[in-house]
């Protein structure tokens, strides 16, 4: 298989096939991460796929696919605290696992910014604390709110608890702080304090904590503030958002300002200028890891200049200007007791290793992913074997190898769904290759798929219905009151029709909680375009892709009309080309939408759902720019900024960046070497401008 060959040994045909395989594999992994909140690959495995894709594209630039993978976020807020909406998302960081990953990160930064080789690219470097992220809002120097990270958009309001931490100033010291700012950092518990806490908990007959991070998170999220006050919590400040005015020119200066304002900052943070210095620092910190007073799981590097951070911007889950260099995964040996099958929302069957419980990195592990049947065959693993497992950060543990074979019989992947009994098949793509994952063909008749889709539909990243979580969805489904998304909005009627007692009489509910739930459901009868599309749980169409479609089509009606037209006309239709012409949208997403529309039961479900909800139009951000809402295409060589930076800037101004030229294109920016796109633009009579004219239009001359 071409997937086993070194990149330099691939023929052009093999490279094209490998790029297609990688596009599908990465899209599957992205869907699992963004849609299911259940990553199926370790960070290292995922990064290996992306790096191979990049290497092939670098060697065969002409083969780069339209759906080429591009850089693409914790847990939801609980019910015990008020929700707190972040003024700017609290994003995660992309990871690096090798020295080469770090070097590639620096190369990407230089390429994006268009830096000359001799120009200094400075970074800050600091230990990556393994704790709980916290955002602190200050107005006129006074602490107004403290919020946990949550899902990155909405966290929990833990202000009263945060005020008990000595490292968090209630009033900022010194001067120069902005009128309003969110200071962000990490709540943690020192190792010695953790040991003392667990000793006290054990002496009192209470359950002890697995590790310092769990202890810190559990202590901060106490409903009784006195319990939080009694716990030895610490806080490091290292980032910020939503500052009302600039207060520093570099990351290093900003963190120094935090210290001046009364925050505790990490004394190990340094400013460095070369990749060699970065890697030397990593080795130094790794060597000191065991002796530090707090747990760390890597080192974080950030571009030091804030103007460059602003230019670099963000992708959906992470800033382009920062990366976490993770320490090697921790490993252990245990016995494989059995292999269970989990059925996901899109029907994927995932084998899960059931293990003799073992402690790995301070966490008791009893399950680990086996990914798919090909991986099981590669490992030669079966129940009864002694296996080596590893756990890296918060990634699902994985089985690495068989250490000692057992006496158990060989294990085979079932060819029927263990939940509904439908056939489980490996889909064949256009090139005749089998999908790595076996999928249940039962669709919505499969209870496992139905429940998982319902959970996704009401999740924070989709409709975000307050008080309706996984537990409630499962209960309503088991009772027969909710079988499909539209049933959520018919809950009261369905309960009555099924002859069930009123909701307020159910165990765990009362009159007040029932009223609150019904009100929360009614509040979602108007739903934003992107949330609605993401909520449908269509394969390859997650949070990021849904937002891209919303920005491009603006209204649900026009978008779904294009999907219908593409499904009817096929891949040669103008509608299909319109879908894949959106920058960042590939063939996998477009074809998945067409397949969804092609299923009668999906059309019936969608029609019934649209009788219950109104999908709100996407409103372009009011940037005051003349390009807001315009569809633009870049072609040829840009000389004043890189292509990536130009696209990012256009999107920030509210423009819709497309990858192909059509009659719906408003502006084509053509640089030297522009080819077929320029010819087509001229044939269609579209507005064509040079890079300088474009910069003048957006006010960046």
Curated annotation (Swiss-Prot):
Keyword Manganese recorded: yes
Family to which the UniProt record says this protein belongs: Belongs to the NAD-dependent DNA ligase family. LigA subfamily.
Organism, as annotated: Hyphomonas neptunium (strain ATCC 15444)
Residues of the active site: 128 (n6-amp-lysine intermediate)
Residues the record lists as binding NAD(+): 43-47, 92-93, 126, 149, 186, 302, 326
Record-level GO cellular component terms: cytosol
MF (Gene Ontology): DNA binding; DNA ligase (NAD+) activity; metal ion binding
Catalytic activities: NAD(+) + (deoxyribonucleotide)n-3'-hydroxyl + 5'-phospho-(deoxyribonucleotide)m = (deoxyribonucleotide)n+m + AMP + beta-nicotinamide D-nucleotide
Keyword tRNA-binding in annotation: no
Name of the protein this chain belongs to: DNA ligase
Entry keywords, A to Z: DNA damage, DNA repair, DNA replication, Ligase, Magnesium, Manganese, Metal-binding, NAD, Zinc
Residues the record lists as binding Zn(2+): 417, 420, 440, 446
SMART domains noted in UniProt: BRCT, HhH1, LIGANc
HAMAP family per the UniProt record, alphabetical: DNA_ligase_A (MF_01588)
Function text: DNA ligase that catalyzes the formation of phosphodiester linkages between 5'-phosphoryl and 3'-hydroxyl groups in double-stranded DNA using NAD as a coenzyme and as the energy source for the reaction. It is essential for DNA replication and repair of damaged DNA.
Pfam families attached to this UniProt entry: BRCT (PF00533), DNA_ligase_aden (PF01653), DNA_ligase_OB (PF03120), DNA_ligase_ZBD (PF03119), HHH_2 (PF12826)
Domain annotation BRCT: ranges: 622-701
Cofactor annotation: Mg(2+); Mn(2+)
UniProt GO BP: DNA repair; DNA replication
């Amino acid at each position: 298989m071409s997937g086993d060959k070194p990149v330099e040994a691939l023929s052009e045909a093999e490279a094209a096939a490998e790029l297609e395989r990688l596009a599908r594999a990465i899209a599957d992994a992205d869907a699992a991460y963004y849609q299911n909140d259940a990553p199926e690959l370790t960070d290292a495995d995922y990064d290996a796929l992306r790096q191979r894709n990049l290497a092939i594209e670098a060697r065969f630039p002409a083969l780069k696919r339209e759906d080429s993978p591009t850089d693409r976020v914790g847990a939801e807020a609980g019910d015990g605290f008020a929700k707190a909406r972040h003024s700017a998302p609290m994003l995660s960081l992309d990871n690096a696992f090798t020295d080469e990953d770090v070097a590639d990160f620096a190369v990407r930064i230089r390429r994006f910014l268009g830096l000359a080789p001799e120009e200094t690219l400075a970074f800050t470097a600091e230990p990556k604390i393994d704790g709980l992220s916290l955002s602190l809002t200050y107005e006129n120097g006074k602490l107004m709110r403290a919020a946990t990270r949550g899902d990155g958009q909405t966290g929990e309001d833990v202000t009263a608890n945060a005020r008990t931490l000595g490292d968090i100033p209630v009033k900022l010291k010194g001067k120069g702080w902005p009128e309003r700012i969110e200071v962000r950092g990490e709540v943690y518990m020192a190792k010695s304090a953790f040991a003392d806490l667990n000793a006290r908990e054990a002496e009192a007959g209470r359950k002890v904590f697995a590790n310092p991070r769990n202890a810190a998170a559990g202590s901060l999220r106490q409903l009784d503030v006195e319990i939080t006050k009694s716990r030895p919590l610490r806080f490091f400040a290292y980032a910020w958002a939503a500052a009302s005015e600039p207060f520093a020119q570099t990351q290093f200066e900003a963190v120094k300002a935090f210290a001046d304002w009364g925050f505790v900052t990490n004394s190990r943070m340094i400013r460095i200028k070369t990749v060699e210095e970065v890697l030397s620092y990593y080795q130094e910190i790794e060597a000191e890891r065991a002796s530090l007073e707090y747990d760390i799981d890597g080192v974080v590097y950030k571009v030091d200049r804030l103007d460059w951070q602003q230019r670099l911007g963000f992708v959906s889950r992470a800033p382009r200007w920062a990366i976490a260099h993770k320490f090697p995964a921790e490993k252990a040996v245990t016995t494989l007791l059995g292999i269970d099958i989990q059925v996901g929302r899109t029907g994927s069957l995932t084998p899960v290793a059931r293990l003799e419980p073992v402690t790995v990195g301070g966490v008791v592990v009893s399950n680990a992913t086996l990914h798919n049947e090909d991986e099981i065959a590669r490992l030669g693993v079966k129940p009864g074997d002694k296996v080596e497992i590893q756990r890296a950060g918060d990634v699902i543990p994985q089985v690495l190898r068989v250490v000692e074979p057992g006496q158990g019989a060989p294990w085979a992947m079932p060819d029927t769904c263990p939940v509904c009994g439908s056939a489980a098949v490996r889909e064949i793509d256009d090139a005749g290759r089998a999908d790595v994952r076996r999928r249940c063909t039962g669709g919505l008749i499969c209870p496992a798929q139905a429940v998982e889709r319902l959970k996704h539909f009401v999740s924070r990243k989709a409709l975000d219905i307050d008080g309706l979580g996984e537990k409630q969805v499962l209960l309503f489904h088991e009772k027969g009151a909710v079988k499909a998304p539209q049933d959520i909005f018919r809950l009261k009627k369905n309960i009555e029709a099924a002859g069930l007692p009123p909701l307020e009489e159910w165990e765990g509910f009362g009159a007040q909680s029932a009223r609150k739930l019904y009100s929360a459901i009614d509040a979602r009868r108007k739903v934003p375009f992107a949330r609605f599309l993401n909520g449908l749980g269509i394969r390859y169409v997650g949070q990021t892709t849904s937002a891209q479609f919303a920005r491009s089509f603006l209204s649900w009606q026009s978008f779904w009309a294009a999907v219908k037209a593409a499904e009817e006309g096929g891949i040669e239709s103008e509608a299909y080309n319109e879908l894949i012409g959106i920058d960042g949208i590939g063939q996998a997403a477009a074809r998945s939408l067409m397949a969804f529309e092609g299923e009668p039961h999906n059309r019936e479900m969608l029609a019934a759902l649209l009788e219950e909800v109104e999908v709100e139009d996407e409103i372009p951000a009011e940037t005051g720019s003349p390009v807001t809402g315009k569809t633009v295409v870049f072609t040829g060589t840009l000389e004043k900024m890189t292509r990536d930076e130009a696209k990012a800037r256009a999107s920030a101004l509210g423009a819709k960046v497309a990858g192909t030229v059509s009659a719906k294109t408003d502006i084509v920016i053509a640089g030297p070497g522009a080819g077929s796109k320029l010819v087509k633009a001229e044939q269609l009579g579209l507005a064509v401008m040079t890079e300088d004219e474009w910069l003048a239009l957006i006010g960046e001359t």
